[in-house]
């Protein structure tokens, strides 16, 4: 697991109040981890803080799983 993956999974576990072992790259925020719309906004904000980047609204809406978050951060040089 890469450093980015580990950091994303840790943030997801903390923000969604789930055990880190239950957070996999394929976990979806809403369906599998029980996030609501406020949780997802807070999660995106935490990712922005951790990786010192800005995640636009359109990208945030498409970010529905742990892997989507990891891919976005890896593919954006700002992160």
From Swiss-Prot:
Pfam families given in the database record: PP-binding
Disulfide bridge partners, by residue number: none
Pathway this chain belongs to: Lipid metabolism; fatty acid biosynthesis
PROSITE patterns in the cross-refs: CARRIER (PS50075), PHOSPHOPANTETHEINE (PS00012)
O-(pantetheine 4'-phosphoryl)serine sites (modified residues): 37
Domain of life of the native organism: Bacteria
Keywords from the named record: Cytoplasm, Fatty acid biosynthesis, Fatty acid metabolism, Lipid biosynthesis, Lipid metabolism, Phosphopantetheine, Phosphoprotein
GO biological process: lipid A biosynthetic process
GO terms, molecular function: acyl binding; acyl carrier activity
Intracellular or extracellular location(s): Cytoplasm
Record's keyword annotation contains Glycoprotein: no
Carrier domain location: 2-77
The record's account of how the chain is modified after translation: 4'-phosphopantetheine is transferred from CoA to a specific serine of apo-ACP by AcpS. This modification is essential for activity because fatty acids are bound in thioester linkage to the sulfhydryl of the prosthetic group.
UniProt key word rRNA-binding: no
Coiled coil (residue ranges): none
GO CC terms of this entry: cytosol; membrane
Its job: Carrier of the growing fatty acid chain in fatty acid biosynthesis.
Record family assignment: Belongs to the acyl carrier protein (ACP) family.
Protein name (record): Acyl carrier protein
Organism of this sequence: Xylella fastidiosa (strain Temecula1 / ATCC 700964)
Lineage, highest ranks first: Bacteria, Pseudomonadati, Pseudomonadota, Gammaproteobacteria, Lysobacterales
Gene label: acpP
